[in-house]
Amino acid sequence: MYLENYKIEGSINNDTDPCFHDVNTYPLFQEKMEEFKKLLIELVDNNESKTFYKYGDGDYFFLTKQSVGSAAPGKRALSKGYININHEQFVEGAQLCDYYTCEIYPTNKDRFEQVIDRKIDFPAEYGYGLVANKWLFKQFSGKIGLIGADTKINIIENLMEAEQYQEYLGLEKFEDYVRLPQQFACDDLDATEKMVGEQLQKTSSKIFLMGMGHVKSGLIHRLKKYTDAVFLDVGSSIDAIAGIIDVNRPFFGDWTNYQINEPPLYEGVDFLQYDSSIGKHLVLERN
């Protein structure tokens, strides 16, 4: 069982990594979480436009042009080789956000320092836990939108038509849904920015939760051009809202994956490490 220091009330962490059993990994985990929550409230209340970049292990491989996992050409981020894109746009863009979060695994922190010349402001686990315990939804009700892969945003929109799911999240609705391609969004950064920017100009949300894959390295810092909002990268938390999260991801151990019994809605969806045989599931019926 992970230490009390690393608990986020209202969530369960199934991740067995030793870092969660060592108080020295991140001694101020609880104090910094309160600071993080206070900062978000302050930024939203003041209608400030700020960006939060969540670093994960895949970002290291993408930023160093290594064909590993999601960073491999033809897999998810790119349909073509690194030599065929302006990779420097992503490397430079990754340095230009306002705040940075990183999972507390020692390897991730070490690799972060190799590719991003900024300090880590907060553990990325906060973005998981505060979705898992619904704090973000309740705190920013009426002000919150989503940015993510088109396939997953479509699922979420359909789920949110059900009152039962609204009650589960503690949120009547998301104010805005902004879509980007699930695959190969890094092939043409400017085209992806244009697609997202045109949507953002029509939004009213004061805070966006985002999960956009590796294109974020070049894109996140550009979003402030289109609307004044807090852009919070929560990574795979978007998968949780879409009802397809791997419950062994940090702090989603008690999450219920709500789904709709309509197979076409899930065609072509990138399920990442999601396993439908593990965790709690609930199938919603259409009214």
Please tell me what each predicted stretch does.
Residues T107, Q182-F184, I238:
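Residue-level detector of flexible, active-site-proximal loop/helix-junction positions
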Residues G142-I144, S205-F208:
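Short active-site oxyanion
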Residues V215-N287:
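C-terminal functional extensions of proteins
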Residues E35-L39, N84-E88, D188-L200, K216:
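A short, acidic, amphipathic alpha-helical segment used as a generic capping/interface helix at domain edges
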Residues F52, L146, F174-R179, F231:
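Conserved beta-strand scaffold positions in the cores of enzyme catalytic domains, especially
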Residues M210-G213:
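Glycine-rich beta-strand-to-loop/alpha-helix junction loops that act as flexible
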Residues M1-G170:
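Electropositive, gly/pro-rich neighborhoods at or near active sites that engage anionic ligands
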Residues Y165, G170-I207:
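A mid-sequence, solvent-exposed acidic-amphipathic segment
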